[in-house]
Design a protein with these regions (language model features):
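Peripheral docking tails and interdomain loops at the edges
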Residues: 46, 50-132
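Conserved phosphate/anionic-ligand binding catalytic regions in large, soluble enzymes, centered on
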Residues: 138-159
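Short, small-residue-biased leader/transition segments that mark boundaries at the very start
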Residues: 1-7
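Short acidic, glycine/serine/threonine-rich loops at helix termini
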Residues: 9-11, 33-35, 58-62, 92-97, ...
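Short helix-loop-beta junction
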Residues: 9-22, 73, 158-166
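Solvent-exposed alpha-helices and their adjacent loops that cap or buttress functional pockets
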Residues: 39-42, 74-76, 130-136, 161
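Generic long, charged, amphipathic alpha-helical segments
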Residues: 12-40
């Protein structure tokens, strides 16, 4: 996985007793195969690789292909490696979608985040899942560019940080 998705969901599931994990790729190129192999526990049963891109005409997405190549000939050579897409079309990735990936760990190819009516690879989702700690306040701001949103948000953050204990 490249990006910030999955961390809260993985913590949530492991706290509930599930045996799941995530490897976050922080530097993609050059790809370090040995670092990946070292990060995977010997008890792994499935490896699902999430790519935030679609490569039409390719055998798979970039990270998926690199993971398959890295594991070839290693002690994980027999572990199934499955590839999925997420975040296509700038769609947000929700906790329920991440849980669907874990619940469908044996599915060879999949898509989350969009209704994939072309390849029909979308995973079925369960009920919405809330992984945010109680008492957390979330805000989402949209800007159109040059409309002052960035400056207004900086000021809001300063006000909240200076005048409340919510930081």
């Amino acid at each position: 996985l490249v990006g910030s998705e999955m961390c809260k969901e993985t913590d949530y599931l492991t706290a509930a007793g599930e045996k799941v994990g995530v490897v976050k790729v922080r530097l993609y190129r050059p790809f370090c195969a040995q670092a990946l192999i070292d990060a995977i526990p010997d008890t792994v049963k499935y490896i699902n690789v999430l790519d935030r891109t679609k490569e039409p005409g390719a055998q798979g997405e970039p990270l998926y292909l690199d993971v398959v190549s890295a594991l070839k000939g290693s002690k994980f050579d027999a572990v199934p490696v499955n590839g999925g897409r997420y975040g296509l079309g700038s769609k947000d990735t929700t906790p329920a979608q991440i849980v669907a990936v874990f619940n469908n760990a044996d599915k060879e190819r999949f898509t989350i985040g969009i209704n994939d009516d072309v390849t029909n690879l979308s995973l079925e989702l369960g009920a919405p899942l809330v992984t945010t700690p109680e008492g957390t306040i979330n805000c989402k701001f949209w800007g159109l560019g040059a409309d002052g949103t960035v400056g207004a948000n900086k000021n809001s953050i300063k006000i909240i940080g200076d005048n409340t204990d919510m930081y």
